[in-house]
């Protein structure tokens, strides 16, 4: 099946959030299932120094009163075809922000639509977040192309109707209130990045004012869990770590813990409970909860805390003040450093994710992969990926709390600290977390089924037997599977959708 991914990010070249990881890692997993997968993204200025891009474009087009060029290259990690939309508006190295952000991404969506109509027509055009939200609207008139829209974060919804009226030729009645709403209305399938988040966004608490619309389209909405690249994130072969290790031999973690304590200016002590956090420092991630419980936690336990990330100025300043007030026990690094992030995953005893909401979350998967036990709030994808630790039955992979309240978070932290003191049980907990399977191969099977469903192809993938070891059901919402709110359109396509 021909599948075109359209997104504003793609790891490792352009990555701001989890969407970049998905767009960089899911396509090669789908290619293993015999899909012809290609990617298209804005031609940001930085890409010309990172990729081998031919001087001459493969095609030139015009849309929204502007000319653009399409350049073809390949993804540096997986070799899949990668198309770049060339236009001066993408020349600056910034990805998001700026007064022209709405116009830039609406233009990218329009150029992608022209590319799909004139250069390489996919059977499935897979769009990601509001930046590509107008593509399902424009492609809806083409019965040969099915559209899938993935919600990575419902909070970011794109330009409102009055802006779209001025930027595009699209009539008002096809736009919804904003770009996100338009995509939800016109995409043939919509998926969130975890089953729990797919259910949560249909409620007023998490629906970001779109819960009514999401309930209306619930027949085509489902949740598919994100995965991680098990080869890229492998503690047994990670060259950035001072010492490698595996679930069978955790001895290297002690070396990494010492290196992490030294690098972050903490007191070096192998018996101290070391907590790590790698995150955008924003309201969503629960940084305010951490600020409220840190002083008490440090006063009553022998814990240390390290934080890596950037974000809101106020939160950065508060974390910096905590570090000044608690030298040797609390350290913050206000930047993003991939090697340091890996050291935190591979050297910390536990990993903090007290999120206000969490569509899926990648960090908890990486933490478990590296033996750092997650302490998380029961929300979104954290519910689907971190079962609560039960010392009696020896099940679970982390410590969970329900309410977004300091007392709940503090209680979970103390429970984890007490468990850490029982080293044999803690080692078993680490090993159980490290052996969880959250590979993209498993998630790809669910996407494969969704593609086939939307195109009217019910037979399994030719190579599905190769990956039968992965559970088809886990990572998706069974109640959503096979539902179709647009049966007539699917019937028209059925005779056209061939591999």
Curated annotation (Swiss-Prot):
Keyword Electron transport: no
Stretches the record annotates as Disordered: 471-499
Gene Ontology terms: biological process: glycogen biosynthetic process
Record has Phosphoprotein as a keyword: no
Catalyses which reaction(s): [(1->4)-alpha-D-glucosyl](n) + ADP-alpha-D-glucose = [(1->4)-alpha-D-glucosyl](n+1) + ADP + H(+)
Pathway noted in the entry: Glycan biosynthesis; glycogen biosynthesis
One Pfam family, short name: Glyco_transf_5
Compositional bias per record (Polar residues), positions renumbered to this chain: 471-485
Residues where ADP-alpha-D-glucose binds: 15
GO molecular-function terms, A-Z: alpha-1,4-glucan glucosyltransferase (ADP-glucose donor) activity; alpha-1,4-glucan glucosyltransferase (UDP-glucose donor) activity
Alphabetical list of CDD domains matching this protein: GT5_Glycogen_synthase_DULL1-like
UniProt keyword annotations, A-Z: Glycogen biosynthesis, Glycosyltransferase, Transferase
Taxonomic superkingdom: Bacteria
EC id: 2.4.1.21
Biased composition (Basic residues): 488-499
Family indicated by similarity: Belongs to the glycosyltransferase 1 family. Bacterial/plant glycogen synthase subfamily.
Free-text function comment from the UniProt entry: Synthesizes alpha-1,4-glucan chains using ADP-glucose.
Name of the protein described by the UniProt record: Glycogen synthase
Natural source organism: Prochlorococcus marinus (strain MIT 9303)
């Amino acid at each position: 099946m021909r599948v075109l991914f359209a997104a504003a990010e793609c790891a490792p070249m352009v990555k701001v959030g989890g969407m970049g990881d998905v767009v960089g890692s899911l396509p090669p997993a789908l290619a293993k299932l015999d899909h012809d997968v290609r990617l298209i993204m804005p031609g940001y200025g930085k890409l010309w120094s990172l990729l081998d891009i031919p001087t001459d474009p493969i095609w030139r087009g015009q849309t929204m009163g502007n000319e653009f060029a399409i350049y073809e290259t390949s993804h540096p990690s997986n070799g899949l075809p990668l198309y770049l939309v060339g236009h001066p508006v993408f020349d600056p190295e910034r990805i998001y922000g700026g007064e022209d952000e709405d116009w830039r991404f609406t233009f990218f969506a329009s150029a992608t639509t022209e590319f799909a109509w004139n250069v390489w027509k996919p059977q499935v055009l897979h769009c990601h977040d509001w930046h590509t939200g107008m593509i399902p609207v424009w492609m809806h008139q083409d019965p040969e192309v099915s559209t899938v829209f993935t919600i990575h974060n419902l909070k970011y919804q794109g330009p409102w109707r009055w802006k779209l009226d001025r930027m595009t030729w699209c009539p008002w009645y096809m736009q919804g209130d904003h770009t996100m709403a338009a995509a939800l209305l016109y995409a043939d399938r919509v998926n969130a990045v975890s089953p729990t988040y797919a259910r949560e966004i249909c409620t007023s608490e998490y629906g970001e004012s779109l819960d009514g619309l999401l309930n209306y389209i619930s027949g085509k909405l489902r949740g598919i869990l994100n995965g991680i690249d098990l080869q890229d994130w492998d503690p047994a072969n990670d060259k950035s770590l001072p010492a490698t290790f595996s679930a069978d031999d955790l001895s290297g973690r002690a070396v990494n813990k010492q290196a992490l304590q030294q690098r972050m200016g903490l007191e070096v002590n192998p018996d101290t409970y070391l907590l790590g956090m790698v995150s955008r420092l924003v309201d969503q991630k629960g940084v305010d909860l951490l600020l409220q419980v840190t002083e008490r936690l440090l006063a009553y336990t022998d814990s240390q805390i390290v934080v890596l990330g950037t974000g809101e100025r106020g939160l950065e300043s508060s974390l910096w003040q905590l570090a000044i007030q608690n030298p040797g026990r609390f350290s913050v690094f206000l930047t993003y450093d991939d090697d340091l992030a890996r050291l935190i995953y591979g050297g910390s005893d536990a990993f903090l994710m007290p999120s206000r909401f969490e569509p899926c979350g990648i960090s908890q998967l990486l933490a478990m992969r590296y033996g750092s036990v997650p302490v998380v709030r029961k929300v979104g994808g954290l519910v689907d990926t971190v079962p609560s630790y039960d010392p009696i039955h020896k099940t679970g992979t982390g410590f969970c709390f329900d309410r977004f309240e300091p007392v709940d978070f503090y209680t979970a932290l103390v429970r984890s600290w007490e468990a850490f003191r029982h080293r044999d049980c803690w080692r078993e907990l680490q090993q159980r977390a490290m052996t969880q399977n959250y590979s993209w191969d498993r998630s790809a099977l669910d996407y494969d089924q969704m593609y086939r469903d939307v195109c009217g192809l019910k037979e399994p993938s030719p190579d599905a037997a190769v990956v039968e070891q992965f559970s088809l059901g886990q990572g998706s919402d069974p109640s959503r599977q096979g539902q179709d709110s647009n049966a007539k359109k699917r019937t028209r396509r059925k005779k056209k959708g061939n591999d």
